[in-house]
């Protein structure tokens, strides 16, 4: 299980939202490409990017930052936010992006996801953002009556790379993950799952290690890294396979 640092973009800046609320936004000083480069030096194996402006409006406005990140780092980039067409996906791939995340478009046009996952096998990720178990769309501004678990079951027959599942109620809180939600997803799919939302400490990371053998591939972390709750190097030490035997999951510490 890998830690995947997150860069959320608004107006070309690194930001974090609290529970997905655009009115509760915190800006960070580093330029996005500088932040990505720093995390690569710290030992990140991937970079996760969300274009929040595009997620909200459907129109990409942060391509300059995305291109610069792709040119700056030598590790794979996955990106989501407002990706709703094959043309947009091909454009992002041309920038050097490795994988794309389809969220709103996946829910509104399942056949498109099926076609694109066949055309680009292993490069399409389905992002499912949920509040109280039900899916939210359009940058979390619209709430549906669709259960996240139902969507996961439906998409599990497609040739997608992974699911990214975000619990909106914990996102940006630093108060811990929703383990029951993560478990409910892992129980119904054989496709790798990446969890997002709520990690605020090394203990929170340790609590997820037990899900690795059930298909938890990675965990996305943003605010905790920006606010220096722990470093990527510390996280990698916890999550690396060779340290699993040293971890006491009952007391949440590692030797």
Curated annotation (Swiss-Prot):
Record bears the keyword Amino-acid biosynthesis: yes
Catalysed transformations (reactions): 1-(5-phospho-beta-D-ribosyl)-5-[(5-phospho-beta-D-ribosylamino)methylideneamino]imidazole-4-carboxamide = 5-[(5-phospho-1-deoxy-D-ribulos-1-ylimino)methylamino]-1-(5-phospho-beta-D-ribosyl)imidazole-4-carboxamide
One Gene Ontology term, aspect cellular component: cytoplasm
Domain of life according to the entry: Bacteria
Gene3D superfamilies: Aldolase class I (3.20.20.70)
Sample GO molecular function, one term: 1-(5-phosphoribosyl)-5-[(5-phosphoribosylamino)methylideneamino]imidazole-4-carboxamide isomerase activity
Pathway annotation: Amino-acid biosynthesis; L-histidine biosynthesis; L-histidine from 5-phospho-alpha-D-ribose 1-diphosphate: step 4/9
CDD domains, per database record: HisA
EC number: 5.3.1.16
Subcellular location: Cytoplasm
S-S pairs: none
InterPro entries recorded: Aldolase_TIM, His_biosynth, HisA_bact_arch, Isoase_HisA-like, Isoase_HisA-like_bact, RibuloseP-bd_barrel
NCBIfam families assigned to the protein according to its UniProt record, in alphabetical order: 1-(5-phosphoribosyl)-5-[(5-phosphoribosylamino)methylideneamino]imidazole-4-carboxamide isomerase
Record-given protein name: 1-(5-phosphoribosyl)-5-[(5-phosphoribosylamino)methylideneamino] imidazole-4-carboxamide isomerase
């Amino acid at each position: 299980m890998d830690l995947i640092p997150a860069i959320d973009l608004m107006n070309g800046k690194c930001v974090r939202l609290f529970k997905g609320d655009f009115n509760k936004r915190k800006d960070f000083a580093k330029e996005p490409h500088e932040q990505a480069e720093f995390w690569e030096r710290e030992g990140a194996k991937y970079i996760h990017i969300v274009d929040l402006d595009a997620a909200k409006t459907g129109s990409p406005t942060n391509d300059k930052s995305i291109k610069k990140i792709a040119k700056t780092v030598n590790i794979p980039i996955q990106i989501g936010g407002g990706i709703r067409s094959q043309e947009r996906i091909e454009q992002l791939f041309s920038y050097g992006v490795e994988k794309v995340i389809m969220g709103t478009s996946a829910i509104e046009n399942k056949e498109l996801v099926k076609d694109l996952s066949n055309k680009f096998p292993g490069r399409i990720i389905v992002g499912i953002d949920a509040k109280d178990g039900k899916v939210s769309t359009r940058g979390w501004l619209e709430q549906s009556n669709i259960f996240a678990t139902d969507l996961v079951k439906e998409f599990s027959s497609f040739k997608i790379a992974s699911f990214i599942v975000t619990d909106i109620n914990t996102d940006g809180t630093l108060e811990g993950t929703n383990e029951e939600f993560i478990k409910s997803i892992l129980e119904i799919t054989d496709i790798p799952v990446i969890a997002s939302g709520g990690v605020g400490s090394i203990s929170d990371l340790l609590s997820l290690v037990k899900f690795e053998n059930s298909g938890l591939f990675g965990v996305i972390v943003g605010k905790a890294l920006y606010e220096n709750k722990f470093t990527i190097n510390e996280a990698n030490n916890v999550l690396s396979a060779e340290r699993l035997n040293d971890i006491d999951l009952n007391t949440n510490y590692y030797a």
